[in-house]
Amino acid sequence: MAPALLLVPAALASFILAFGTGVEFVRFTSLRPLLGGIPESGGPDARHGWLAALQDRSILASLAWDLCLLLLFVVQHSLMATEAVKAWTSRYFGVLQRSLYVACTALALQLVMRYWETTPRGPVLWEARAEPWATWVPLLCFVLHVVSWLLIFSILLVFDYAELMGLKQVYYHVLGLGEPLSLKSPRALRLFSHLRHPVCVELLTVLWVVPTLGTDRLLLALLFTLYLGLAHGLDQQDLRYLRSQLQRKLHLLSRPQDGEAE
């Protein structure tokens, strides 16, 4: 195992890469379609209908390329999460296993965003162009995106994302505290195994709630919706555990502070 002098910078580098990728993902999924950094459609006169789009090789080529990028991300994200690959990476990278997974995921997502091809001449599923929709729909989408991202960031702070990002493993290793997950209750471990992406609803809101839903955005939203749906498997035991934890936290928050009960 590498000395702590190398472990800490490696874990921090992975975290910084993931953080920068997250910022870029906000731009890619929200700022671009809402603020028009890169147009997602070329106007009603420049676009094909759905049947004509199926015969346009340039549109089909762009969608096929985007699909390959998304599949690359999905395969990487899923394959490296399997027990066999985790055992192999743990054997050779030790406590940096999670940091390696996070870094590879960030790089795969960077490839998706950097080489994504839009389809400005493709058809749209919906578009807010006529007034008053052209004014109010983008504003409503902007508000929902802001709320969704605030919820996502809040959940990241409340959820044990230091462990999910790989920082906690290195921190505990340097201090000789062992594996962070070994200190969690069996019910918490069971929940973590079923819910490693605790921002599903908010992310789907960001993907689908846009003023103009073109073909490339539709492909992005559909594939991530399918992937997130298949990646989550909460059952009644998980829901009961979440409910009990929520009630416990609400009870702690509702308790009077010292001197307030007098």
UniProtKB/Swiss-Prot annotation:
Residues 29-58, 115-133, 211-216 are perinuclear space. This is Nurim. The keyword Nucleus applies. Belongs to the nurim family. InterPro entries: Nurim-like (IPR033580). GO terms for cellular component: nuclear envelope; nuclear inner membrane; nuclear lamina; nuclear membrane. It is a multi-pass membrane protein. Residues 1-4, 81-97, 165-191, 235-262 are nuclear. It is found in: Nucleus inner membrane. The keyword Nucleotidyltransferase does not apply. The chain crosses the membrane at residues 5-28, 59-80, 98-114, 134-164, 192-210, 217-234. It comes from the Eukaryota. Keywords: Membrane, Nucleus, Transmembrane, Transmembrane helix.
